[in-house]
C-alpha cells in the first residue's frame, strides 16, 4: 500500500499541479486510511471492499470527524482507488457505491465597512512594521488574496504603474487582480522606503518581510491580524480569510458581477463564489428583521 500511495501522491502533484497544502491534506487522509486497514489486518489493496470502507467511515465518525472532513476523506480515497485501478495496481474499485455525505456550508464571518476601516487604521504608520502591516491589510482587503498567496508574493509580482498584482493561486494557477489608488499609494511607499529598511543584509525578493529581513510566515500574518483585531475591538473571529470574505461580499453588495468576483478570487467553481451572495442576502434579512415594524 505504501508504494501505491506514494505513486498516487506523485501523480496528483505532477499531473494535476496541486498545491503543497492540498497534497498534505491528501497525505493525511491516506495515512488515516492506511492505519485503519493495518489495524484490521488488511494487507493488500484487493482485499478492500465496500463493507470495509463503510466500517472505516463509521470509525472516523465515532472519532468525531465532521461531515465536511468525511466528505473530503471519501473524495481522497475514491480518487486513490480510481488511480490504483487505472494503473493496474488493483483489480477493482471498492468506492463505486460509496456515497459522499452532504454537509451544510457555513456562512463565513464578514466585517462591516466601519470594522474594516477600524482594522486598517490600527497599525502605527510611524514604525516600519506598522507601515508594513497597514500595507498588507490594505492589499488583503483590496484583492481578496489567500494568506498563502500573499506570503508567496515577490516584489516583481506587483505592477504599480499598470495597477495590478500577479497572484499564483491553488495549483499554481496565475491570475491578475487590479489594484485601487489607496493600496497603490501604500505599496509605493512600502516598496520604495520601508521594505529596504526591513531587508537588512538579506537578498530575498519576498514582498512582505519580518523584522529579520525574511519572508513573513503564514502564522506570523495570522498573529498580526488577530492582534490588530483585538486593538480595533472587533468582536468577530478574525483571520486573513475574513478579509477575503469581506472583499467578496462588499463587491457583490455593491453590484459587482459574480463572474468578475470569481476571477479575482481565483475560484475554479462559481458555486464557491455564489456562497457570498447568500451572505449578502442574510445581511439583508437581518436588517429587515431589525428595522421593519412588521418583521
From Swiss-Prot:
<dbReference type="InterPro" id="IPR023009">
    <property type="entry name" value="Tyrosine_recombinase_XerC/XerD"/>
</dbReference>
<keyword id="KW-0238">DNA-binding</keyword>
<feature type="active site" description="O-(3'-phospho-DNA)-tyrosine intermediate">
    <location>
        <position position="276"/>
    </location>
</feature>
<dbReference type="InterPro" id="IPR011932">
    <property type="entry name" value="Recomb_XerD"/>
</dbReference>
<keyword id="KW-0233">DNA recombination</keyword>
<dbReference type="GO" id="GO:0009037">
    <property type="term" value="F:tyrosine-based site-specific recombinase activity"/>
</dbReference>
<dbReference type="GO" id="GO:0007059">
    <property type="term" value="P:chromosome segregation"/>
</dbReference>
<keyword id="KW-0229">DNA integration</keyword>
<dbReference type="InterPro" id="IPR004107">
    <property type="entry name" value="Integrase_SAM-like_N"/>
</dbReference>
<comment type="subunit">
    <text>Forms a cyclic heterotetrameric complex composed of two molecules of XerC and two molecules of XerD.</text>
</comment>
<feature type="active site">
    <location>
        <position position="267"/>
    </location>
</feature>
<comment type="function">
    <text>Site-specific tyrosine recombinase, which acts by catalyzing the cutting and rejoining of the recombining DNA molecules. The XerC-XerD complex is essential to convert dimers of the bacterial chromosome into monomers to permit their segregation at cell division. It also contributes to the segregational stability of plasmids.</text>
</comment>
<keyword id="KW-0131">Cell cycle</keyword>
<dbReference type="GO" id="GO:0003677">
    <property type="term" value="F:DNA binding"/>
</dbReference>
<dbReference type="GO" id="GO:0051301">
    <property type="term" value="P:cell division"/>
</dbReference>
<feature type="active site">
    <location>
        <position position="146"/>
    </location>
</feature>
<feature type="active site">
    <location>
        <position position="170"/>
    </location>
</feature>
<keyword id="KW-0159">Chromosome partition</keyword>
<feature type="active site">
    <location>
        <position position="241"/>
    </location>
</feature>
<feature type="domain" description="Core-binding (CB)">
    <location>
        <begin position="1"/>
        <end position="85"/>
    </location>
</feature>
<keyword id="KW-0963">Cytoplasm</keyword>
<dbReference type="Pfam" id="PF00589">
    <property type="entry name" value="Phage_integrase"/>
</dbReference>
<dbReference type="InterPro" id="IPR010998">
    <property type="entry name" value="Integrase_recombinase_N"/>
</dbReference>
<comment type="similarity">
    <text>Belongs to the 'phage' integrase family. XerD subfamily.</text>
</comment>
<dbReference type="InterPro" id="IPR050090">
    <property type="entry name" value="Tyrosine_recombinase_XerCD"/>
</dbReference>
<keyword id="KW-0132">Cell division</keyword>
<feature type="domain" description="Tyr recombinase">
    <location>
        <begin position="106"/>
        <end position="289"/>
    </location>
</feature>
<dbReference type="InterPro" id="IPR011010">
    <property type="entry name" value="DNA_brk_join_enz"/>
</dbReference>
<dbReference type="Pfam" id="PF02899">
    <property type="entry name" value="Phage_int_SAM_1"/>
</dbReference>
<dbReference type="GO" id="GO:0005737">
    <property type="term" value="C:cytoplasm"/>
</dbReference>
<dbReference type="InterPro" id="IPR013762">
    <property type="entry name" value="Integrase-like_cat_sf"/>
</dbReference>
<dbReference type="InterPro" id="IPR002104">
    <property type="entry name" value="Integrase_catalytic"/>
</dbReference>
<feature type="active site">
    <location>
        <position position="244"/>
    </location>
</feature>
<protein>
    <recommendedName>
        <fullName>Tyrosine recombinase XerD</fullName>
    </recommendedName>
</protein>
<dbReference type="GO" id="GO:0006313">
    <property type="term" value="P:DNA transposition"/>
</dbReference>
<dbReference type="InterPro" id="IPR044068">
    <property type="entry name" value="CB"/>
</dbReference>
Amino acid at each position: 500500500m505504501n508504494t501505491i500511495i506514494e505513486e498516487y501522491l506523485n501523480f496528483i502533484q505532477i499531473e494535476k499541479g496541486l498545491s503543497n497544502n492540498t497534497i498534505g491534506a491528501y497525505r493525511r487522509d491516506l495515512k488515516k486510511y492506511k492505519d485503519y486497514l493495518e489495524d484490521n489486518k488488511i494487507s493488500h489493496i484487493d482485499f478492500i471492499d465496500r463493507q470495509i470502507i463503510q466500517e472505516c467511515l463509521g470509525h472516523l465518525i465515532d472519532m468525531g470527524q465532521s461531515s465536511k472532513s468525511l466528505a473530503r476523506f471519501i473524495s481522497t480515497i475514491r480518487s486513490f482507488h480510481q488511480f490504483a485501478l487505472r494503473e493496474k495496481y488493483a483489480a477493482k474499485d471498492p468506492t463505486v457505491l460509496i456515497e459522499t455525505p452532504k454537509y451544510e456550508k457555513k456562512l463565513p464571518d464578514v466585517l462591516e465597512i466601519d470594522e474594516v476601516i477600524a482594522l486598517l487604521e490600527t497599525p502605527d504608520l510611524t514604525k516600519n512594521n506598522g507601515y508594513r502591516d497597514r500595507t498588507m491589510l490594505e492589499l488583503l482587503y483590496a484583492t481578496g488574496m489567500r494568506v498563502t498567496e500573499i506570503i508567496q508574493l515577490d516584489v516583481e509580482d506587483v505592477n504599480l504603474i499598470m495597477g495590478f498584482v500577479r497572484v499564483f493561486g491553488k495549483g499554481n494557477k496565475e491570475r491578475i487582480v487590479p489594484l485601487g489608488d489607496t493600496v497603490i499609494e501604500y505599496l509605493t511607499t512600502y516598496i520604495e522606503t520601508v521594505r529596504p529598511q526591513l531587508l537588512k543584509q538579506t537578498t530575498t525578493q519576498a514582498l512582505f518581510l519580518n523584522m529579520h529581513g525574511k519572508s513573513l510566515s503564514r502564522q506570523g500574518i495570522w498573529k498580526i491580524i488577530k492582534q490588530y483585531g483585538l486593538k480595533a475591538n472587533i468582536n468577530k473571529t478574525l483571520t486573513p480569510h475574513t478579509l477575503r470574505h469581506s472583499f467578496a461580499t462588499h463587491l457583490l453588495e455593491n453590484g459587482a458581477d459574480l463572474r468578475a468576483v470569481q476571477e479575482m478570487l481565483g475560484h475554479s467553481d462559481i458555486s464557491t463564489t455564489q456562497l457570498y451572495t447568500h451572505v449578502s442576502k442574510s445581511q439583508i434579512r437581518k436588517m429587515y428583521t431589525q428595522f421593519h415594524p412588521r418583521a
